[in-house]
């Protein structure tokens, strides 16, 4: 078969017949260079999301010639990067987001990190970045957390955000699969994602002129380009007095995601059934870890129908007219659960009676998830820092 022009169908030159190429990195090979000057830890109550960083970071370099280098935990600092690196020109990159929580028993826990590692590998395939052993990456992250564990806030309203990032670093302006890459992990102590508070409802701006993702695209991958391309719509949402964008898709204005969140609708459906519904994973929805956890929790409860289905703005408007909507809320690692109170659509503000209804379900889900995350309830969804 003839090679495609971007080199996707052919192995790198350094991969042909070489037994020296390291197919993955190993946690046992970690090189640790401790920081000589440690920063002052911030007050958990004063944290701004993503603005403060810990003392150390993890880096692992890769090249087609030699494969993976040894992982390195080093003092937090700037990255040396070539001006022609593919990440800077063609957005060859991906990232993840997960959290470490200091429990009521002072133990540090991660919430379902295996799902983040799985998603990171799927995104790597889509971006043509090299594979690695996801269990080894998790071991390296745990070692990084062990070193910076005092940065995990002593608070049940704050956490330590973990940001693994994977970028193409080949110094070339050619549009092709990169022959060099860098995987790095940074840590940031965080409070509530939204400045208005962790459980204050948000308003949404829905306008079909902007589209977040489409079939065959990268909407189901956690890639920076998906977020950078959303900023103009987010600015317009704020100009219209709303806090987030409700992304629509197709001629029937299907409801997909909310800004940085998956979306749930708790309602009485067209058949008169009590139902918790969320858009399906059809290639344009990010498969959120919190989303999956909410679906599994609700299915375990068995108290109402739980459904992954397409929802349109007409479905929502009709349900609102019939007083069939109970709650709407977003979900995500950063926000956990966030109620929705209003949607601005076609010049009309649609009020969602989420807060008038408690919100009983959103509050229950938030309570259950945070009980697990902060160790108030034992669960196999968490792993403890050794």
Swiss-Prot record:
Pfam families per the UniProt record, alphabetical: Aminotran_4
Database matches in Gene3D superfamilies: 3.30.470.10, D-amino Acid Aminotransferase, subunit A, domain 2
Subcellular location as annotated: Cytoplasm
Residue positions, PTM N-acetylmethionine: 1
Reaction equations catalysed: L-leucine + 2-oxoglutarate = 4-methyl-2-oxopentanoate + L-glutamate; L-isoleucine + 2-oxoglutarate = (S)-3-methyl-2-oxopentanoate + L-glutamate; L-valine + 2-oxoglutarate = 3-methyl-2-oxobutanoate + L-glutamate
Modified residues (N6-(pyridoxal phosphate)lysine): 222
UniProt keyword rRNA-binding present: no
GO molecular function: branched-chain-amino-acid transaminase activity; L-isoleucine-2-oxoglutarate transaminase activity; L-leucine-2-oxoglutarate transaminase activity; L-valine-2-oxoglutarate transaminase activity
Protein name: Branched-chain-amino-acid aminotransferase, cytosolic
Keywords: Acetylation, Amino-acid biosynthesis, Aminotransferase, Branched-chain amino acid biosynthesis, Cytoplasm, Lipid metabolism, Pyridoxal phosphate, Transferase
Annotated SUPFAM superfamilies: D-aminoacid aminotransferase-like PLP-dependent enzymes
Tissue note: Expressed in brain and kidney. Overexpressed in MYC-induced brain tumors, lymphomas, as well as in a teratocarcinoma cell line.
E.C. designation(s): 2.6.1.42
InterPro entries, per the entry: Aminotrans_IV, Aminotrans_IV_CS, Aminotransferase-like, B_amino_transII, BCAT-like_C, BCAT-like_N, BCAT_family
Family membership: Belongs to the class-IV pyridoxal-phosphate-dependent aminotransferase family.
Primary localization: cytoplasm
Quaternary state and interactors: Homodimer.
Role summary: Catalyzes the first reaction in the catabolism of the essential branched chain amino acids leucine, isoleucine, and valine.
Gene Ontology biological process: amino acid biosynthetic process; branched-chain amino acid biosynthetic process; branched-chain amino acid catabolic process; lipid metabolic process
Named cofactor requirement(s): pyridoxal 5'-phosphate
Cellular component GO terms, alphabetical: cytosol; mitochondrion
